[in-house]
UniProtKB/Swiss-Prot annotation:
This is Formate--tetrahydrofolate ligase 1. SUPFAM superfamilies: P-loop containing nucleoside triphosphate hydrolases. GO terms for biological process: tetrahydrofolate interconversion. It comes from the Bacteria. The keyword Nucleotide-binding applies. Belongs to the formate--tetrahydrofolate ligase family. InterPro entries: Formate_THF_ligase, Formate_THF_ligase_CS, P-loop_NTPase. One of its GO terms (molecular function) is ATP binding. It is an enzyme of class 6 (ligase). It comes from Streptococcus pyogenes serotype M18 (strain MGAS8232). It catalyses: (6S)-5,6,7,8-tetrahydrofolate + formate + ATP = (6R)-10-formyltetrahydrofolate + ADP + phosphate.
């Protein structure tokens, strides 16, 4: 079979002006970035606000292997299949970060015959959103350092600046740096550091803002530092929220592209789910819901991370909750959770599938807590055997969850038809009655304990010395009513990435909280989760090149 990029480059793309007509978007409603990419205008988003929202399908997954289990690919294939069934459907996905593209992933625009196009553009600079977010973030850093240099009227303690610089690359050498060295004219020396752009609070804000006014308010509410007497300093104190909004005025508009099958797709925003809330923008999802009968969206990593945050953090900002949740599972990942070594995952092992099923079962039970119907999608791989597939289907039947085999990577829309039909049937027969896991009125401590015990299956939560102090401080500042966004490994329900399956007798330690008051949540840091990733021993970048005619090579 051809590689992802070979398949993508063999497709005759339709002009984006033709694609968007399928969902009632005219040429005057979009701002073109070439022939095949566009941004949706504020006027069109405003015009459809009164429309009744369509059905919403959330795609999530079990705890993944390092290669991922194919949520984006499944989302794309499912949307294409729904369209093939005659359902007016849109996709609402995140846009890739260059860091993982150059690092371990090599691309994040789907795969095989379930891709969004033009995949080279989407994986690289796209419409410049990532660069705008990076620039806004680093402009704020520069303005903070300038405030220190110009007299520090706010009394900012340079030792307690919590705002970091960012870069849309994996670069471990920049995790901790010292700025302002050389001479007094170079600024006030202090410790600083870089996060990856998708970990920036500005990325989260862009993805939760409902319009420019809301964007500006959220930017003003960012906490950047503390004063010498330990009081928080906000962006509004620096009076630069207007400038930051100006930098982001185009980046906030959702991007329109197409799938291989011509399904309209809104690709916008890209926060990671292990260090942020892991969902595409509220604007993209809300607009898709008002333009289409069915919207397919996804949340990053496993359901314990992305889906939990989608349901607890994003849904309160949407016109509606999901009508159904699709949990993607692969036999290779289930075997890994069943104790099989990575080198042996290709060998048939039905017993390991049975053991690893505990991971999928917990995710199904967790999603059912939110009172939303669940469907399991088996993402088919070449090495899967009939016996393993039959074993998994039988296990799903035991817990009464609908399950379908999907081969969208190999067969595109046709490979997702059975899943699409089952999803539609479930939505028609079983109405969702969304229930949030916790209340805003719960304390931060109660919210964390709720997530750890109800979603992760943990026994208890340990709060480190710094976290204990912050619980008191944040309550004094009025931040304790915000949702919690857990920063945790994606590979396990616990904070130990090697503890696979469905562990129960474990504690999770919160070492620190990070206020993201502009985004509207508090991040709880667990384990060794890094907000600036490093590159692997053999980065995907080493296989990338460009042909003499400008064609991209090596993306996948």
């Amino acid at each position: 079979m051809k590689s992802d990029i070979e398949i993508a480059q063999s497709v005759a793309l339709q002009p984006i002006t033709d694609i968007v007509k399928k969902v009632g978007i005219d040429g005057d409603d979009i701002e073109l970035y070439g022939k095949y990419k566009a941004k949706l205008s504020f006027e069109k988003m405003k015009a459809v606000e009164a429309n009744e929202p369509g059905k919403l399908l959330l795609v999530t997954a079990i705890n993944p292997t390092p290669a991922g289990e194919g949520k984006s690919t499944m989302s794309i294939g499912l949307a294409d299949a729904l369209n093939q069934m005659g359902k007016k459907t849109m996709l609402a996905l995140r846009e890739p970060s260059l860091g993982p593209v150059m690092g371990i992933k090599g691309g994040a625009a789907g795969g095989g015959y379930a891709q969004v196009l033009p995949m080279e553009d989407i994986n690289l600079h796209f419409t410049g959103d990532m660069h705008a977010i990076t620039t806004a973030n680093n402009a704020l850093s520069a303005l903070i350092d300038n405030h220190l240099q110009q007299g520090n009227d706010l009394g900012i303690d340079p030792r307690r600046i919590i705002w970091k610089r960012v870069l849309d690359l994996n670069d471990r050498a920049l995790r901790q740096v010292i700025v302002g060295l050389g001479s007094p004219v170079n600024g006030v020396p202090r410790e600083d550091g870089f996060d990856i752009t998708v970990a920036s609070e500005i990325m989260a804000i862009l993805c939760l803002a409902t319009d420019l006014k809301d964007l500006k308010k959220r930017l003003a509410d960012i906490v950047v530092a503390y004063t010498y007497d330990r009081k928080p300093v906000y962006v509004r104190d620096l009076k630069v929220e207007g400038a930051l909004t100006l930098i982001l005025k185009d980046a906030i508009k959702p991007n329109l592209v197409q799938t291989i099958y011509g399904t309209p797709a809104l690709i916008h925003g890209g926060p990671f789910a292990n260090i942020a809330h892991g969902c595409n923008s509220v604007l993209a999802t809300s607009t898709a819901l008002r333009l289409a009968d069915y919207t397919v969206t996804e949340a990053g990593f496993g359901a314990d991370l992305g889906a939990e945050k989608f349901l607890n953090i994003k849904v309160p900002n949407l016109p509606k909750a999901p009508d159904a949740i699709v949990i993607v599972a692969t036999l290779r990942a289930l075997k890994m959770h069943g104790g099989v070594a990575k080198s042996d995952l290709a060998a048939e092992n039905c017993e390991a599938v049975r053991l690893g099923f505990a991971n999928l079962k917990r995710h199904v039970e967790n999603m059912r807590q939110f009172k939303v119907p669940v469907v399991v999608a088996i993402n088919e791989f070449v090495a899967d055997t009939e016996a393993e597939i039959a074993t998994l289907k039988a296990l799903c039947e035991e817990i009464k969850v609908p399950v379908e085999l999907a081969s969208v990577w190999a067969n595109g829309a046709e490979g997702g038809l059975a899943l699409a039909k089952t999803a539609v049937r479930v939505i028609d027969q079983e109405a969702a009655d969304y229930k949030r896991l916790y209340s805003d009125e719960d304390t931060l401590e109660e919210k964390v304990i709720n997530i750890v015990t109800q979603i992760y299956g943990g026994k208890a939560v340990q709060f480190g010395p710094k976290a204990k102090t912050q619980l008191k401080q944040f309550a004094e500042f009025g931040w304790d009513k915000l949702p919690v966004c857990m920063a945790k490994t994606q590979y396990s329900f616990s904070d130990n990435p090697s503890l696979l399956g469905a562990p129960t007798d474990f504690d999770i330690t919160i070492r620190e909280f990070v206020p993201k008051t502009g985004a509207g949540f508090i991040v709880g840091l667990t384990g060794d989760v890094m907000t600036m990733p490093g590159l692997p021993k053999v980065p995907a970048a080493m296989a990338m090149d460009v042909a003499e005619n400008g064609t991209a090579l090596g993306l996948f």
